[in-house]
Each structure stands twice: as C-alpha cells, then as structure tokens.
Regions:
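Cystatin/cathelin-like cysteine-protease inhibitor module
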Residues: 12-131
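Sec-dependent signal peptide recognition
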Residues: 1-4
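C-terminal motif of bacterial Sec signal peptides marking the signal peptidase cleavage site
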Residues: 7-10
Length: 131
C-alpha cells in the first residue's frame, strides 16, 4: 500500500517536463485560422469572468500567428476592464487567447510579449455581455 504513491509519482515524473495536450500538436507548423474566434472568446469570458456584466473599454485585435512556448499558435489579444466585486473598475488589462487547431485553447494573463505591436478595434460585444 505504501508503494502506490511512489509508483504513481515515478510515472508522473517520467515525462521530462512535457506538457499535457489533448490536441494534435503541430509544433512550429502553421495552424488553421480560428474562424469563430470572436464567438469563442465571448463564450469563454462569460464563464471566466466573475462578473461578465459591465465590462468597459473592450478592444480586440485580429488573430495573428506567434510562436508561444516553442509552438506556432494563433493569438487573439484583447484589452478590457472588468467590474470588480465591489462595483469598481481597475485599469484595462491586456490578455492573449491562444488557439490550437482553430479552437480556443487557453488564456494568457501576461500578454505583453505576444500582443506587442497589434492594432486593436472596439469589441462592443464584450461590453454587452450578460449572465
């Protein structure tokens, strides 16, 4: 019984730092364009944000291909200010949404590098979100 945790930890440690992915990883090969990126971003943020109502100053950039963690990914950058639990607002923050195989994979809270030099346009749909 005492050996079970040791055996399981050995299995977990034997991947040599490889990340777990459930998609077909093309590495540095080109990815398909995320055609429904706006809809996917809105659906994700509706569940991700503590309060999706009352978002301000929302802007979004068109998807661009970037190398993230040694892998080619489409990145959609956005900047917005979400309503806090006390009803106030912080300064708008930039976030990056990563797409794999044309589908939303994850969000990067620290988006300074992947979002450098992008042109933003208003994202009114995000400001109109409801619960």
């Amino acid at each position: 019984m005492m050996l079970l945790p040791i055996v399981l930890s050995a299995c977990a440690a034997s991947d040599e730092g490889k990340s777990i992915t459930f998609t077909d990883d093309r590495g540095v090969a080109s990815q398909p364009f995320p055609r429904n990126y706006r809809t996917e971003v809105l659906s994700f943020l509706k569940t991700y944000l503590n309060n999706p109502v009352g978002v301000r100053d929302a802007v979004i950039a068109e998807p661009v291909e970037r190398v993230i963690g040694g892998r080619q990914r489409y990145v959609v950058c956005l900047r917005f200010s979400a309503r806090e639990s006390d009803g106030g607002y912080r300064e708008p923050r930039e976030r990056a949404m990563l797409f794999v195989d044309g589908r939303l994979d994850r969000i990067l809270e620290n988006a300074a590098e992947p979002c450098t030099g992008l042109a933003y346009a208003p994202f009114a749909e995000l400001e109109k979100l409801t619960r």
